[in-house]
């Protein structure tokens, strides 16, 4: 099990020796050990540590925005007789003042299965690794990223997960082999933790076909049988924070964030299925960068919305169950009206 209190994973023992030398006054030995310890830190750990420096402020709950969101949700739930309040998970971050972001949420801290929304996280991790020099965004990788985000290909997603984890989940593994497999597949989660995001589990492929034995083993967290306790999960608040970092060019660097947002741009004129999602509720002249997710029991969207006047907000709406109505679109439309009124 990883030591959650280590500054760099796998280095606690090394730095303890350095600290002991410091306490006993053996400065020369301590400096030598410090150099050795730093040189032997995994490259990935340096990237994680550096990534956590200078992140944008976390959003604080705004009573005013919360009251507005509660009214909007209540109004739209009344219009949907086939949608229960417990099925709705929602978060809004207002970025009007980037240094004082405001948060409101509705069941937004409850974890749900994110379906294809998780793909935006895998995209972010690939760009992070590219920035660290671990992999290269080749034309083939770029094509797979496009297929994963735009048409939301599960096949492309599986390829991307295998790329960053250097694994293949076809066959079941021995306990020793499984431990290494699990470590590799949880690399994306370690990156998220370095960003301060703890309420996302991003380690599984997205499936639209039979699941191989090795992947089932991982879904069961290594057990030979039983429930899938290791599924991908996400809260609306955590998804919104992830998108806030993307919107503020803090997820990786500006060039990478620009490329990611470009992949996520939505246009209802060319993507008719977006009419019931966030983009469907925004006026002409707005820009929406989002990732949807749909299965037999999920209907999600998570996006960055930039209004014609330049005001930006994050909106994540996860709906569980078989509902397929206009709730997401209508909430998006009402939030647009609210923010425009606030500016007048």
Which ranges hold each PLM region?
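N-terminal secretory signal peptides that target proteins for export/translocation
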Residues: 1-23
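Bacterial N-terminal signal peptides
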Residues: 29-41
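Active-site SXXK
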Residues: 113-135, 148, 315
């Amino acid at each position: 099990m990883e030591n959650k209190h280590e500054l760099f994973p796998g280095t606690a023992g090394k730095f303890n020796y350095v600290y002991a030398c410091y306490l006993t006054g053996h400065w020369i030995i301590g400096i030598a050990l410090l150099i050795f310890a730093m040189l032997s830190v995994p490259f990935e750990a340096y990237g994680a540590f550096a990534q956590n420096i200078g992140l944008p402020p976390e959003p604080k709950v705004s009573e005013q925005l919360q009251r507005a969101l509660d009214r909007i949700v209540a109004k739209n739930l009344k219009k949907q007789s086939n949608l229960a309040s417990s099925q709705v998970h929602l978060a809004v971050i207002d970025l009007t003042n980037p240094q004082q972001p405001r948060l409101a949420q509705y069941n937004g801290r409850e974890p749900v299965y994110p379906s294809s929304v998780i793909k935006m996280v895998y995209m972010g991790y690939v760009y992070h690794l590219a920035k660290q020099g671990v992999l290269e965004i080749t034309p083939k990788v770029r094509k797979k990223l496009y297929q994963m985000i735009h048409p939301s290909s599960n096949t492309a997603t599986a390829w991307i997960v295998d790329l960053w984890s250097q694994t293949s989940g076809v066959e079941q593994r021995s306990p020793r082999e499984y431990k290494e497999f699990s470590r590799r597949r949880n690399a994306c989660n370690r990156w998220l933790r370095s960003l301060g995001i703890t309420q996302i589990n991003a380690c599984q492929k997205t499936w639209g076909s039979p699941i191989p034995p090795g992947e089932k083993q991982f879904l069961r967290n290594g057990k030979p049988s039983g429930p899938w306790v290791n599924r991908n999960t996400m809260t609306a608040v955590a998804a919104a924070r992830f998108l806030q970092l993307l919107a503020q060019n803090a997820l990786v660097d500006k060039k990478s964030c620009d490329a990611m947002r470009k992949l996520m741009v939505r246009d209802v004129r060319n993507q008719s299925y977006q009419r019931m999602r966030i983009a469907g509720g925004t006026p002409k002249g707005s820009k929406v960068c989002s990732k949807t997710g749909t299965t037999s029991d999920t209907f999600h969207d998570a996006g960055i919305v930039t209004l014609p006047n330049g005001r930006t907000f994050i909106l994540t709406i996860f709906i569980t169950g078989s509902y397929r109505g206009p709730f997401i679109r209508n909430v998006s439309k009402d939030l647009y009206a609210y923010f425009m009124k606030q500016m007048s």
